Every structure is written in structure tokens, then in C-alpha cells.
A protein has these predicted regions:
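Conserved alpha-helix/loop element of class I SAM-dependent methyltransferases that forms part
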Residues: 8-27, 42
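Class I SAM-dependent methyltransferase SAM/SAH-binding core
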Residues: 30, 36-86
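A short acidic, Gly/Pro-enriched loop at the edge of an enzyme's catalytic core
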Residues: 85-96
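A short SAM/SAH-binding and catalytic strip from SAM-dependent methyltransferases
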Residues: 95-108
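A short glycine-rich, Lys/Arg-flanked "PGG" loop and its adjoining helix->strand segment in the class I
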Residues: 110-125
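Conserved catalytic/acceptor-binding region of the Class I
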Residues: 127-195, 204
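Core SAM-dependent methyltransferase catalytic element
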Residues: 176-179, 249-257
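C-terminal helical/coil "lid" or tail adjacent to the Rossmann-like core of SAM-dependent
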Residues: 182-243
Length: 257
């Protein structure tokens, strides 16, 4: 289930991505594109005296997010169904805006940034986190495994997204007129000496994500079933005792002038 994969991913990456994310007491934070609340729980726990408004266009995802926050006993989050491009908030309503794994799915991420900046007060911060599937390297090397990742990227592009957007964060935020743009790479490396990362990231995050693209890749004619199965089998070798896997996320923080 995709919600389970997202929760596993968020838990595994919590310290790597959020160790330097904290919002002051009383601040209002917009989480745009909260999905099933996987990142929401981490944000709300790390900044218990900040108030979060978490929005998503999907009612189904919001229902799962509300349930997750309720189970966690967190009370500093309010959820609302909303389109990122038509946010139902007044100009300058928020002190901070947080966006994680959202821009990669948008046909026009450049158009999303002005919509987010409209509701951010002058001097407020925008934090954006994205991956970049072109940064995936693994051993044993396999052209068949690499092809499955390329199929994931192509399927995402066919849906209007960009699986390589991490490398573009700096120019995107600069072009949007943001100041003090700082982008930091967050590296994941997994081998058998780091079993938590092998299981939590290589298996349950990355390989699970690639496997989730099977239906789209086959439907689009990007690959046949036999080649897909062979590629996935080879990719899974990176999670064995002699395998290794590395990947880079990008975290950008900037301010509205």
C-alpha cells in the first residue's frame, strides 16, 4: 500500500531530512501537499508549539492523514482540502511554508511557487525537499535494474512530473524571486553494515517505489513484463549482503523578500 510505503519512508528519513527543521513557538506553518500525513507527524512532533495548516487536494489522503495525527495524539495540526494553485488563505497568512515531495509531481512547478509565496509573509521561509532519481547508484551494477528506474522516471514524466527535480531546486527558487536560497544535499548510503538503511530505504522506500511504477511502465509500453521482472530482481541484489545503494535528496531553504 502506498500509504504504508510513505510512512516507512518518512520514518527512515526523519533525521536525515528534518534534523534542522524547527519552527518557533506560535508560528503559523503551511504544509502544502501533505498527502497521507507522513511528513506532518514528524513536523508537528519536532515543533510542538507551532501551528500547522496542512492541505491536500485529495479527500482520501486527508482522511488517512487525520487518522494518523489523531493516533499520534498531536493537536497542533489542522487539515483542509485545497488546491495548491488556489489556496484559500489571505496574502501573508503564514510565517513559514513547507513542501516535501510535491513539486516532482506537478506539470508546472514554476507556477506553484508564486501561489505558495502569496500566502507567505515577507521575510518568511520556504522549505522544499525533493529527491532526484538520477542520483541512484548501486552495486552490483545492472543495466536491467537501471532500466526499471528509467521506466519509473519516464512514467512520471508521462504523468507530467519530473523525477529529476532535486537538481533544479536552486534555479527554480531563484527564478521565483526568493532570497538567501540555500540547497543542501542529503546523502543516503546503505550496505549490510547499516541494516536499518538497507531495510528502511533500499527495500521499503526506493525499490518499493520502483515496483509501484510497474503498471504504468507496462501500460505505456516502456518495457515488457519479463524485462521488468529481471530488472527488479537485479535491483533487489543491492539489498543483499554484498550489495550497496546510495541516493541523494535535496533540501532548499529560502526567504521571501
Amino acid at each position: 500500500m502506498e500509504a504504508t510505503r510513505l510512512a516507512d519512508q518518512a520514518g527512515t528519513l526523519a533525521d536525515l531530512l528534518h534534523q534542522d527543521t524547527a519552527y518557533p513557538a506560535g508560528s503559523r506553518v503551511l504544509e502544502a501537499g501533505c498527502g497521507v500525513g507522513a511528513q506532518t507527524r514528524i513536523l508537528a512532533r519536532r515543533s510542538p508549539t507551532a501551528h500547522f495548516a496542512s492541505v491536500d487536494v485529495s479527500a482520501e489522503s486527508l482522511a488517512l492523514a487525520r487518522a494518523a495525527i489523531s493516533r499520534a495524539g498531536l493537536t497542533n495540526v489542522e487539515f483542509q482540502q485545497a488546491d495548491l494553485f488556489a489556496l484559500p488563505f489571505a496574502d501573508g497568512s503564514f510565517d513559514h511554508v513547507f513542501v516535501c515531495f510535491v513539486l516532482e509531481h506537478l506539470r508546472q512547478p514554476e507556477a506553484a511557487l508564486p501561489a505558495l509565496l502569496r500566502v507567505l509573509r515577507p521575510g518568511g521561509s520556504l522549505t522544499v525537499i525533493e529527491g532526484d532519481h538520477g542520483s541512484a547508484f548501486f552495486h552490483p551494477k545492472s543495466a536491467r535494474a537501471q532500466r526499471t528506474i528509467e521506466c519509473l522516471n519516464q512514467a512520471q514524466a508521462a504523468a507530467g512530473g519530473d523525477a529529476l527535480i532535486g537538481r533544479r531546486l536552486y534555479p527554480l527558487l531563484r527564478a521565483a524571486g526568493l532570497a538567501d536560497v540555500q540547497v543542501s544535499p542529503r546523502f543516503v548510503y546503505a550496505d549490510s553494515s547499516r541494516p536499518r538503511w538497507v531495510d528502511g530505504f533500499t527495500r521499503k522506500t526506493f525499490i518499493a517505489m520502483v515496483e509501484g511504477a510497474a503498471t504504468s511502465a507496462l501500460r505505456l509500453g516502456l518495457i515488457d513484463q519479463a524485462a521488468w521482472d529481471e530488472g527488479i530482481a537485479d535491483l533487489k541484489r543491492s539489498a543483499t549482503d554484498d550489495g550497496t545503494f546510495c541516493y541523494t535528496f535535496f533540501k532548499a531553504v529560502a526567504h521571501k523578500t
